[in-house]
C-alpha cells in the first residue's frame, strides 16, 4: 500500500512539472491535455491512441476528439476552449495496442477516465495515466485558466 501511494505521489509530481507548459510548443492554453507514462520502462508512452467522448442527452457516448501521444508522452490540441463546454467526458487510452506493439500481452483493453468538466466555469484539465501491463493508475490536475 505504501508503494502504491509513493507511485501516485510520483505521478502527481510529473503532472505538476508538465503543467508548466508543453515541451517546445505554445499550447499552454490547451483546455484538455493527456499525459501517458510507461511504468515498466520508466519513460513516456509514445504513440498511444487516445479517444475522448462526450456524454449525449440520451446517455450515449459521442466521439469528441482523438489523437496519439507525442515523444514526450503528451497529447495536446484535443479541443479548444470554445468546444470544451460543460459536460461529462470520457478519456479512453488504448493500452492494449501499446503493450502489444512492445511484444507484451496486457490484461486491460484500455484505461478509462470519466469526469465532469467545466461545471464550475472554464477549467484546464491534465489527465495523467501511469501504465503497466496488468494495472494502471490515473490522476488529474484541474486549474483555473489565467487571463
Curated annotation (Swiss-Prot):
Detected in brain. InterPro entries: Thyroxine_BS, Transthyretin/HIU_hydrolase, Transthyretin/HIU_hydrolase_d, Transthyretin/HIU_hydrolase_sf, Transthyretin_CS. Its main location: secreted. L-thyroxine binds at residues 35, 74, 137. The modification Sulfocysteine is found at residue 30. The lineage of its organism: Eukaryota, Metazoa, Chordata, Craniata, Vertebrata. GO terms for molecular function: hormone activity. Sulfonation of the reactive cysteine Cys-30 enhances the stability of the native conformation of TTR, avoiding misassembly of the protein leading to amyloid formation. It comes from Pan troglodytes (Chimpanzee). Homotetramer. Dimer of dimers. In the homotetramer, subunits assemble around a central channel that can accommodate two ligand molecules. Interacts with RBP4. One of its GO terms (biological process) is purine nucleobase metabolic process. This is Transthyretin. Keywords: Gamma-carboxyglutamic acid, Glycoprotein, Hormone, Phosphoprotein, Secreted, Signal, Sulfation, Thyroid hormone, Transport. The modification 4-carboxyglutamate is found at residue 62. Residues 1-20 form the signal peptide. It is found in: Secreted. Glycans are attached at residue 118. It comes from the Eukaryota. SUPFAM superfamilies: Transthyretin (synonym: prealbumin). The modification Phosphoserine is found at residue 72. Belongs to the transthyretin family. The gene is TTR. One of its GO terms (cellular component) is extracellular space.
Amino acid at each position: 500500500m505504501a508503494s502504491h501511494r509513493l507511485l501516485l505521489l510520483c505521478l502527481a509530481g510529473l503532472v505538476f512539472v508538465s503543467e508548466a507548459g508543453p515541451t517546445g510548443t505554445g499550447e499552454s492554453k490547451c483546455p484538455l491535455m493527456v499525459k501517458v507514462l510507461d511504468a515498466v520502462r520508466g519513460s513516456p508512452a509514445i504513440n498511444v491512441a487516445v479517444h475522448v467522448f462526450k456524454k449525449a442527452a440520451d446517455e450515449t457516448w459521442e466521439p469528441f476528439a482523438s489523437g496519439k501521444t507525442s515523444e514526450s508522452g503528451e497529447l495536446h490540441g484535443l479541443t479548444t476552449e470554445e468546444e470544451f463546454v460543460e459536460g461529462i467526458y470520457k478519456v479512453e487510452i488504448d493500452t492494449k495496442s501499446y503493450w502489444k506493439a512492445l511484444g507484451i500481452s496486457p490484461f486491460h483493453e484500455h484505461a478509462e477516465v470519466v469526469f465532469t468538466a467545466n461545471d464550475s466555469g472554464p477549467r484546464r484539465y491534465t489527465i495523467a495515466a501511469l501504465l503497466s501491463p496488468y494495472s494502471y493508475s490515473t490522476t488529474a490536475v484541474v486549474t483555473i485558466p489565467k487571463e
